[in-house]
Amino acid sequence: MTDLPDSTRWQLWIVAFGFFMQSLDTTIVNTALPSMAQSLGESPLHMHMVIVSYVLTVAVMLPASGWLADKVGVRNIFFTAIVLFTLGSLFCALSGTLNELLLARALQGVGGAMMVPVGRLTVMKIVPREQYMAAMTFVTLPGQIGPLLGPALGGLLVEYASWHWIFLINIPVGIIGAIATLMLMPNYTMQTRRFDLSGFLLLAVGMAVLTLALDGSKGTGFSPLAIAGLVAVGVVALVLYLLHAQNNNRALFSLKLFRTRTFSLGLAGSFAGRIGSGMLPFMTPVFLQIGLGFSPFHAGLMMIPMVLGSMGMKRIVVQVVNRFGYRWVLVATTLGLSLVTLLFMTTALLGWYYVLPFVLFLQGMVNSTRFSSMNTLTLKDLPDNLASSGNSLLSMIMQLSMSIGVTIAGLLLGLFGSQHVSVDSGTTQTVFMYTWLSMAFIIALPAFVFARVPSDTHQNVAISRRKRSAQ
């Protein structure tokens, strides 16, 4: 990329900066949840909603981000994304109640939903096609560093300052990024078709209401009748979307996508698989602090091996899938992740803390292999005219399933324990043990879906063709 103009290189730095902000925020909060609960006077069992409110908002807003960028311009939308994300961070730091914090996190989610996809679109527009891969590698590298720094930085700030600082650090960075975007980024626009507002609203209502019903089934004071009503509204909204999208060329997501068998299997497996694996980043630091008595900083440091394992496997995952095939790799990694989850719980409860970094490193390797394989299986056989729509739907499903996973983890903690748990007590460890066993079972279930993937020994080379759009 050395032959690119200076202005283009600065624009790539701005996009990389946005990727870093968004990826850092997805992990920095996890280690702070117990301290947030204590400060806000809430049970730690309710704090999963701090993650869910952000991730669910991202899932809901993702389908609109690309259309908005084409309609209004990439600079305007990227600037708006940074401003909303920064304002959300400020309101998070100022929150005095859990409900205020959840609303502020939702505002952050609106910004986060636009930041990454619009950043990808910007790179596509400002960089020559032959240099696209090199440019994307450059701008996504900070996005890989964010998860590495996030847990430890979050723990450090909580332990030596307060949880408010995990949000306050975004403010000066966001101001600089917003100013740089206005000064340096071009405002590309494109001819757009009419936005499928009806489909967008139906999907948004369906996802939000069903997640709320799932969370409301334990400990929120919702009556059974209210929960049944929420479920009914959510199901009706999704059914109406299917009817709306049938034979509708302007639908948000075409139902023609599901004519491709690998897409249908990959999407179903990704949805189920990320429900299970989405529990782990939330549960691990909470378990280390509340279940085992680790300090926030120590718990954050323990997450680094998992990220390193994940980054290490990205270099060889293509060769692994080409050698063994999607079906074998996905079934093996799904069952393997379930076993590693049990191994983590066992070694932790036995007090073998020196083994935990190695177990978490292994967990990161297995999880990364499964994620990359799920993404590429889902997209690799789609025709070119459906590839963009399929990638957008996969991105939305990824975020939705992660929010559902965190919600289920919170429900399991509430099911097996009381609303008030004490740090490092025998009862609390029993609660976490039952929760961890349930998680391992849920993580293993998608193996039944992946076992239906057809043998594809001659199609695995396609993984490299679609990998770019899936990341």
From Swiss-Prot:
UniProt keyword annotations, A-Z: Cell inner membrane, Cell membrane, Membrane, Transmembrane, Transmembrane helix, Transport
GO molecular function: transmembrane transporter activity
Localization per Swiss-Prot or TrEMBL: Cell inner membrane
Periplasmic membrane side: 1-11, 70-76, 125-137, 186-196, 246-262, 307-341, 417-430
Topology, Cytoplasmic side: 33-48, 98-101, 159-164, 218-224, 284-285, 363-395, 452-471
Bilayer-crossing regions: 12-32, 49-69, 77-97, 102-124, 138-158, 165-185, 197-217, 225-245, 263-283, 286-306, 342-362, 396-416, 431-451
Gene Ontology annotations for the cellular component aspect, listed alphabetically: plasma membrane
InterPro entries assigned to the protein according to its UniProt record, in alphabetical order: EmrB-like (IPR004638), MFS (IPR011701), MFS_dom (IPR020846), MFS_trans_sf (IPR036259), Multi-R_MdtD (IPR023721)
Membrane topology: Multi-pass membrane protein
Family, per entry: Belongs to the major facilitator superfamily. TCR/Tet family.
Protein name from the UniProt record: Putative multidrug resistance protein MdtD
Gene name per UniProt: mdtD
